[in-house]
């Protein structure tokens, strides 16, 4: 026996899908505002990094910043650690990385010159890179959520960490130093409406972490991807992220 499941697309149009009675149909959510045809770049920069802005173009001067030069990350969203005139935050987007000491990106505002970035220190603080809201009652007993992430980073000795959180609590964590390129999956299964069992693994390998959370899935909860780099002159990039939900 078959049933019809009706969906509404972003333009308000109706769609129907035929499924067997009792079937569970997974669906996928994109992180809102994810940059088109690009990803998100976090760089630790270096001590004594400076920035200036001319006609909406910010030039970061950071000697041996460690980020791949050329066009690889042009168009990526960039986390800027902040300076007196320009607030810390994510900016769209990188315009150029012409050499090992320079990064340019777009940010509207008044011109300024030679401002110290992050009070003259490298950026090694855990940083939220993207987030979405899982609406209350979207998940049910035995629902499963999987966050699939593609990431890459510099090959120096600093630890590059990606952490996923649900409702502000850690779900999974993936760390790498010299081999920081991987596809990772982190997720959880719901038990009732107030318990989640979380798991995490990389490149199809076995689970690397397991957590028990007690979030109320009848109310809205945040789902966030966070990055951390432990030393100067390195970077971490999210090249893609999507959330699979099996209701």
Region locations from a protein language model:
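Surface-exposed molecular-recognition determinants
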Residues: 2-43, 123-247
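Small/polar beta-strand repeat architecture
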Residues: 43-125
């Amino acid at each position: 026996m078959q049933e019809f499941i009706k969906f509404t697309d972003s333009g308000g149009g109706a769609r129907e899908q035929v499924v067997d009675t009792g079937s569970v149909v997974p669906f996928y959510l994109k992180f809102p505002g994810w940059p088109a045809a690009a990803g998100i770049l976090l760089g630790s920069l270096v001590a004594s990094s400076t920035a200036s802005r001319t006609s909406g173009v910010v030039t970061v001067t950071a000697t041996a910043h460690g980020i791949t030069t050329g066009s690889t990350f042009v168009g990526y969203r960039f986390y800027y650690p902040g300076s007196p005139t320009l607030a810390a935050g994510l900016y769209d987007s990188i315009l150029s990385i012409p050499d090992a000491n320079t990064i340019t990106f777009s940010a509207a505002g008044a011109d300024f010159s030679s401002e110290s970035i992050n009070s003259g220190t490298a950026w090694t603080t855990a940083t939220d890179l993207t987030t979405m809201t899982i609406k209350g009652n979207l998940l049910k007993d035995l629902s499963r959520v999987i966050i699939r992430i593609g990431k890459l980073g510099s090959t120096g000795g600093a630890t590059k960490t990606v952490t996923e959180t649900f409702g502000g609590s850690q779900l999974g964590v993936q760390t790498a130093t010299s081999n920081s390129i991987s596809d990772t999956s982190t997720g959880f299964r719901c038990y009732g409406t107030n318990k989640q069992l979380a798991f995490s693994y990389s490149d199809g390998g076995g689970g690397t972490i397991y957590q028990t959370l007690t979030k109320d899935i009848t109310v809205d909860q945040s789902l966030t991807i966070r990055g951390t780099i432990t030393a100067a002159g390195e970077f971490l990039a999210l090249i893609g992220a999507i959330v699979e939900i099996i209701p």
